[in-house]
Every structure is written in C-alpha cells, then in structure tokens.
UniProtKB/Swiss-Prot annotation:
Metabolic or biological pathway: Carbohydrate metabolism; D-ribose degradation; D-ribose 5-phosphate from beta-D-ribopyranose: step 1/2
UniProt KW keywords: Carbohydrate metabolism, Cytoplasm, Isomerase
Pfam families for the chain: RbsD_FucU
GO biological process assignments: D-ribose catabolic process
HAMAP family: D_rib_pyranase
InterPro entries recorded: D-ribose_pyranase, RbsD-like_sf, RbsD_FucU
Annotated source species: Lactobacillus johnsonii (strain CNCM I-12250 / La1 / NCC 533)
Reactions accelerated catalytically: beta-D-ribopyranose = beta-D-ribofuranose
UniProt record similarity statement: Belongs to the RbsD / FucU family. RbsD subfamily.
Name the UniProt record assigns to this protein: D-ribose pyranase
Function according to Swiss-Prot or TrEMBL: Catalyzes the interconversion of beta-pyran and beta-furan forms of D-ribose.
Protein's UniProt keywords contain Cytoplasm: yes
Length: 131
C-alpha cells in the first residue's frame, strides 16, 4: 500500500506516465471533458474536494514547467487566481481564452475533475523534466 503522496491510483498512474511537455488538466466540476481525454472524477459533493487541495497535491508529484489558465479568471475569480499563483511561484503562467483552454483539453493525457464550483477554476499543467 502506498504510504505518501497522491493516493488515487489513476492520478498516480497518469503522473508516472507523463513525459516532457505532456499536459494534465485539473479543474472544477463543470468543465466539459472531451471524449478522447481520460477523466479522473474526484467530485463527491459541491466543493469537495476543492480545486486548490487537488492542485497542491498534484504539484507535489509532478514537475511543471508551465501552467495554462483561462484569462477570464483575472476578472471573474481573482481570489482563486491568487491561490493558484501561491502554489506555483516559480512556474511560467500563460493566460489563454477559456474557450481555447477547453479545446486544449483534447491534447491532455487526462483531466482531474474536482468538486470545485467557482468560475474558471481550471488549469492545464505542462510537464517539465527533473534533470
């Protein structure tokens, strides 16, 4: 039995399979996940688990070189944006239109759905290398 880190076997598998520049999405309960993208659904009830809790745990295990965030979060959910920035102080952030972020999920290895119900609580993480 795994003792530490992300306990969800599907998340652990996807992270272990990530290569340089692969994408992994993490987001709120309302995000439409493309049929071709694996969905790892963690939602239990509204707000559980939270987007930030899941993101923080994923970031403990995944080397991230870049994060894509919907530009709409700047005006529609600035509190969440500040929380995201605190989790990745040294990672490049690129803001893109929300419609583009949703389309880009087609190229992600997987999408982790949380119970979050606040607007634009979605990111795409681009995997880096550890050497």
């Amino acid at each position: 039995m795994k003792k530490t880190g992300v306990m969800n076997s599907n998340i652990s598998r996807v992270i272990a399979d990530m290569g340089h520049m692969d994408w992994l999405g993490v987001g709120d309960a309302g995000t439409p996940v493309p049929a071709e993208t694996e969905k790892i659904d963690l939602s239990v009830r509204p707000g559980l688990p939270s987007f930030i809790d899941v993101l923080e745990e994923v970031l403990k295990e995944l080397e991230v070189q870049k994060m894509y965030i919907a530009e709409e979060i700047k005006t529609e959910n600035p509190k969440q944006l500040e929380a995201i920035k605190r989790t990745v102080p040294n990672v490049e952030i690129e803001f893109i239109p929300h419609s583009e972020l949703k389309k880009d999920l087609k190229s992600s290895k997987a999408f982790i759905r949380t119970g979050e119900e606040t607007p634009y609580s979605n990111v795409i993480l681009e995997s880096g290398v550890v050497f």
